[in-house]
């Protein structure tokens, strides 16, 4: 077993779906220390949030009670993937299992009040010596092509509320890009006005 100064004990012989981000980024932390990157202002502007993994919680932020309740019919009652239009068969970024960390991320996080996303973001921020991390949605990338225009609005609002009300208040170093329902310009404008004042 290898141990570093942060108190985290590294035990993984290989990378898999359960590998801790601190293990994956152990060399990044070492390089950040060697290069004094903590003294340099660094922003990760393309950090992909695990919105798919958090989808059941995001569905709790749907404002329409009928749609919110209907989400429970997906994923054997888990709400997983509810109303999303992404096609799993077209998502091969894990190179058919050869790059396992990411697709179906199962990395354990400590139980507590913080959202899973905040815990994972903090691990990356701290290991890489970042000042800020800007989150960008994953599952939402397909949403602009949703065949039900109104559903794009409902899901965008739920996602944005989850970010603003749940994730962003937990750590000031975490920033995010809001999802604008661009298929409806009036709603896109209303979204900006609504969340700009938060």
Model regions and ranges:
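Helix-coil boundary/capping segments in enzymes
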Residues: 2-198
């Amino acid at each position: 077993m290898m141990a570093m100064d942060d108190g985290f004990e590294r035990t993984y012989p290989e990378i898999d779906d359960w590998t801790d981000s601190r293990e994956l980024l152990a060399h990044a932390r070492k390089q950040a220390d060697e290069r004094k990157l903590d003294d340099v202002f660094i922003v990760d502007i393309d950090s992909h949030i695990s919105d798919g993994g958090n989808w059941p919680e995001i569905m709790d932020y749907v404002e329409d009670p009928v749609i919110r309740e209907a989400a429970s019919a997906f994923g054997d009652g888990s709400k997983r993937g509810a109303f999303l239009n992404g096609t799993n068969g077209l998502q091969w970024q894990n190179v058919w299992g050869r790059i396992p960390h990411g697709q179906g991320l199962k990395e354990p996080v400590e139980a507590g009040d913080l959202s899973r996303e905040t815990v994972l973001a903090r691990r990356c921020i701290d290991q890489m010596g970042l000042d800020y991390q800007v989150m960008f949605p994953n599952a939402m990338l397909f949403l602009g092509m949703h065949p039900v225009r109104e559903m794009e609005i409902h899901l965008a609002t739920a996602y944005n509320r989850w970010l603003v009300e749940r994730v962003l208040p937990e750590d000031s170093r975490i920033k995010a890009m809001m999802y604008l329902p661009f298929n409806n310009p009036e709603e896109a404008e209303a979204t900006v006005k609504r969340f700009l004042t938060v």
